[in-house]
Amino acid sequence: MDSSYSFALGTSSSILPKLSFRNVENRFYGEKNNNNGLCKRFGSDLGSKKFRNQKFKHGVVYAVATSDNPKKAMTVKTSMFERRKVDPQNVAAIILGGGNGAKLFPLTMRAATPAVPVGGCYRLIDIPMSNCINSCINKIFVLTQFNSASLNRHLARTYFGNGINFGGGFVEVLAATQTPGEAGKKWFQGTADAVRKFLWVFEDAKNRNIENILILSGDHLYRMNYMDFVQSHVDSNADITLSCAPVSESRASNFGLVKIDRGGRVIHFSEKPTGVDLKSMQTDTTMLGLSHQEATDSPYIASMGVYCFKTEALLNLLTRQYPSSNDFGSEVIPAAIRDHDVQGYIFRDYWEDIGTIKTFYEANLALVEERPKFEFYDPETPFYTSPRFLPPTKAEKCRMVDSIISHGCFLRECSVQRSIIGERSRLDYGVELQDTLMLGADYYQTESEIASLLAEGKVPIGIGKDTKIRKCIIDKNAKIGKNVIIMNKGDVQEADRPEEGFYIRSGITVIVEKATIQDGTVI
């Protein structure tokens, strides 16, 4: 273009045209020379060999830049560079909700992982769904397979006709299917196989304008503007972009790990490595903008399981290059690195994979901290869930410390410390809850029904008188009698007691859905 800008360059700021990493506040830590014309022109005009940080937004530079060792102020004239802004209408999201949820068992005994409650009143599926809505992405596919009834019901109640505006978009549930002759052979075999089975949807006329496809997980807790992610993907002209986060050595083997060069390109991917393989994935994360101490604490880069593909690249990978590969993390991505441009996008905000009982429990209880790293309260980017039209919680002479109490609960002269109480929960006189996650109930029992059950020696939904519970997850519609003690005093780490209505995972007692714990039971 013929137009140009003039910039007054002071004596204390500078520019870094080396990296393509961006943070969540929509500003660049830097940009690659070979992909960003604005940085190329600045670098050429300044003639400097070493640069520091510079901020950019769409279309124009709003920070001031100088060389490292300026002798005087100067003016630089550079030609205008316009950055192509991605249209959300050309982006589709695929949310993976079909896993068997083995690591979250027994919470997934009757429900798909994305349908598991979180934060008192939400479901895990609400996280990627809300992030899509807040990012103006309104073409959303949800892939389901195991125990999908409650997930389908929640999606229908929450996102179909309940006031959430999708414009020309949609939310479409794609359930695992079989055709005659395929019985027992064609269930989803992995994340990539699940997407492959439904690539035909992008042949529909309404989806032919889709240029980029997001692949999202249904068991993570985070707040993310996906359009920042997609914009970075388009800016770098990558075939695939992986959203990544720095992690500590103690957590590293739980994730797919990547190595990224200084141009932002992923040069190595290893799925959940251990031992020597884990050590080989260690990297200097100061290049991501971490301080020396932060880099020491988090010397690995984990893939978040959030991917952005060029539509053409995704179709080619799954149907032509790797038609028998079933999983993105362990098969497709590592293979694609060899002959495709795979870029890394560094996400520096809170992110937690809550696909195990331990991480699920810890991530939930972290919400009650005085200054939590993540919270659902944000008027600009709210999290949506099903409208249940419940009355406010009623608490009679209760003591509550660092806790979250959902709508529609009845609490009578009880103590609740560092716990989350789900919707429609009932806590009777003398109950003591500590470090406990209670998922609530799907329906109420009236006072007369409760009285009748107690008179018959039965246990109503909720927690009975003088019961004491610590370090526990109580699934929906559980019935816990009076004078019960659930504390795992023996510090048992793993146990299966389905006939008694509970399991123990990582030292956390899990009372299963609809279980009945009789009066006086000690666990």
From Swiss-Prot:
Superkingdom as given in the UniProt entry: Eukaryota
A GO biological-process term: glycogen biosynthetic process
Localization per record: Plastid, Chloroplast
Keyword Magnesium assigned: no
InterPro entries to which the protein is assigned, alphabetical: ADP-Glc_PPase, ADP_Glu_pyroP_CS, NTP_transferase_dom, Nucleotide-diphossugar_trans, Trimer_LpxA-like_sf
Family statement drawn from the similarity comment of this UniProt entry: Belongs to the bacterial/plant glucose-1-phosphate adenylyltransferase family.
Stated name of the protein: Probable glucose-1-phosphate adenylyltransferase large subunit, chloroplastic
Organism annotation: Arabidopsis thaliana
